[in-house]
Amino acid sequence: RELYEAENEGLTDPSGSQDMCGLIYPGISRLDYDASVEGGWFPSHIESTCDPAVVTWLESVIHLVPLGPRPDGYNPLLTRNMDPAWVKRLGDAGAACYDAIVAMDLAALGDSLNESSRAWRAILPNIYEHETIKGDLWGLLEGYMAEYPGAMQSGCGGGYIIVASDEPPAGSARISVRV
């Protein structure tokens, strides 16, 4: 928490704690957030697995397609549509994602990634459509969603497209889960 506070000191829009938690907790984790717990900045509940079979399976079906860095001047928070129905859909998709991973169910994992992408687009449309983004990022993502069981962007405005598939997309990298 001290590192998080130091990293975000004085920022109007602090970064989320998801990346920090991903570095600290081993294995595969589900992070649940609740606005009534520490203002929603830290998980209210964390569920993790280090099951070797699940880890090996996930490493075999998740592929990262590089997008490049965020463009200068990019701000995904310009438009915020905090519609409770979409927020619930995003939370449900996150829970379904973790359940699909633990069950080693590629189709369900793909569906959860696609649903997460749709929810993020509704809640924060500038993630995909911002004046500083070159090209049609949402269209690119839709192409991966149509060709593979599922896909979503790893971060706002840059990073990677995460693809769930038995076969690696061209130019993709594999992941490694730290246990």
Predicted features and spans:
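C-terminal nucleotide
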Residues: 4-14, 18-154, 162-179
